[in-house]
Swiss-Prot record:
GTP binds at residues 19-26, 81-85, 136-139. This is Elongation factor Tu. Its EC number is 3.6.5.3. InterPro entries: EF-Tu_GTP-bd, EF-Tu_GTPase, EFTu-like_2, EFTU_2, G_TR_CS, P-loop_NTPase, Small_GTP-bd, T_Tr_GTP-bd_dom. GO terms for molecular function: GTP binding; GTPase activity; translation elongation factor activity. It catalyses: GTP + H2O = GDP + phosphate + H(+). Keywords: Cytoplasm, Elongation factor, GTP-binding, Hydrolase, Magnesium, Metal-binding, Nucleotide-binding, Protein biosynthesis. Monomer. GTP hydrolase that promotes the GTP-dependent binding of aminoacyl-tRNA to the A-site of ribosomes during protein biosynthesis. It comes from Exiguobacterium sibiricum (strain DSM 17290 / CCUG 55495 / CIP 109462 / JCM 13490 / 255-15).
């Protein structure tokens, strides 16, 4: 069978299912695929294809995630679903699968459970901007009032974490019913996808954001100047654009990009995803180093102290075998370099166990170009022991 051509005419949006174990996230994922495929006369992704998720490595951490794709009339979706709770935590903290919005699955028979709360908190902390709710298993609840109560409880929980609980869409249905081809439940899946189409806005694409490139390597070309190489993380860099060199030193240097090279060819501009060399005017070989970033002026600043949501690897995952305490000093790996930092634990927390997910305050020994949602790994002697996402800049 020939490969289907990727349709670029429809806007592309990344979503994922979140929620408590056994509330039906994977069944819903399969149901969405089945119902949409049926409506378009295509083949669906089966439940066991999603459940037997392959393992991936992101920032030195192994995460099991299933990626499937489907489309509505308006959009093309990439959907991520994780088999285990720890996989969700790791996925969200490492940003392995960035979500433009999430579908929160809550069983009508249980209502919100501990992981429901944890996934909502994580969504808030790591910047999942929009949540649509699917109340699952409503075919197992006869009491209309009970359904109303559960919906109220979900909305209140979302509001507690600063999501617009009163206004966001809540669809009541049965994922299993839809998967089994029952028309009334299939209808609810279409209603859910309609809500996702309408409520989750199209994301700002990486090329539309402000230019930023982590510096991987630096070398000088006699008679031409200094070249910084790296992969453009976001935005566009045009020849003759002004740039700033940010991080590792208190003061930020300015320069002008006088040339952009890719695969030994000269370009007029580079955009997000390109691996390039940027020729910088008036910059000596010692003014710039790996670990800094090139950025559009006044868009990112160097910081030493921040709060972060982190996941600490369990012993089984190759992490630490013992807990750590306050004043723990590992290395924090940001983009292309390690910087030592000191950890402060939240008030009332004595120690952090391998396998924990917690908010830490970190003070680095050198400033790094940071902003909310910057991802990093935590390492000890080159071995990854955790991962995190910046939730707040302190100074």
């Amino acid at each position: 069978m020939g490969k289907e051509k990727f349709d670029r005419s429809k806007p592309h949006v990344n979503v994922g299912t979140i929620g408590h174990v056994d509330h039906g996230k994977t069944t819903l994922t399969a149901a969405i695929s089945a119902v949409l495929a049926k409506s378009q006369g295509k083949a669906a992704t089966k439940f066991d294809q999603i459940d037997g998720a392959p393992e991936e490595r992101e920032r030195g951490i192994t995460i099991a995630t299933a990626h499937i794709e489907y489309e509505t009339d308006k959009r093309h979706y990439a959907h991520v679903d994780c088999p285990g709770h720890a996989d969700y935590v790791k996925n969200m903290i490492t940003g392995a699968a960035q979500m433009d919005g999430a579908i929160l699955v809550v069983s009508a028979t249980d209502g919100p459970m501990p992981q429901t709360r944890e996934h909502i908190l994580l969504s808030r902390q790591v910047g999942v901007p929009f949540i649509v709710v699917f109340m699952n298993k409503v075919d197992m609840v006869d009491d209309e009032e009970l359904l109303e109560l559960v919906e109220m409880e979900i909305r209140e929980l979302l509001s507690e974490y600063d999501f617009p609980g009163d206004d966001l869409p809540v669809i009541q249905g049965s994922a299993l019913g839809a998967l089994n081809g029952e028309a009334k439940w299939e209808e609810k899946i279409m209603e859910l996808m309609n809500a996702v189409d309408e409520y989750i806005p199209e994301p700002t694409r990486d090329t539309e954001k402000d230019f930023m490139m982590p510096v991987e390597d630096v070398f000088s070309i006699t008679g031409r100047g200094t070249v910084a190489t790296g992969r453009v993380e976001r935005g566009v860099l045009k020849v003759n654009d002004e740039v700033e060199i940010v991080g590792l030193h208190e003061e930020t240097k300015k320069s002008v990009c006088t040339g952009v090279e890719m695969f030994r060819k000269l370009l007029d501009y580079a955009e997000a995803g390109d691996n390039i060399g940027a020729l910088l005017r008036g910059v000596s070989r010692d003014d710039i180093e790996r670990g800094q970033v090139l950025a559009k002026p006044n868009t990112i600043t160097p910081h030493k102290t921040f709060k972060a949501q982190v996941y600490i690897l369990s012993k089984e995952e190759g992490g630490r075998h013992t807990p750590f305490f306050g004043n723990y000093r590992p290395q924090f790996y940001f983009r292309t370099t390690d910087v030592t930092g000191m950890c402060q634990l939240p008030e009332g927390t004595e120690m952090v166990m391998p396998g924990d997910n917690i908010e830490l305050t970190v003070e680095l020994i050198a400033p790094i170009a940071l902003e909310k949602e910057t991802r990093f790994s935590i390492r000890e002697g080159g071995r990854t022991v955790g991962a995190g996402s910046v939730t707040e800049i302190v100074e």
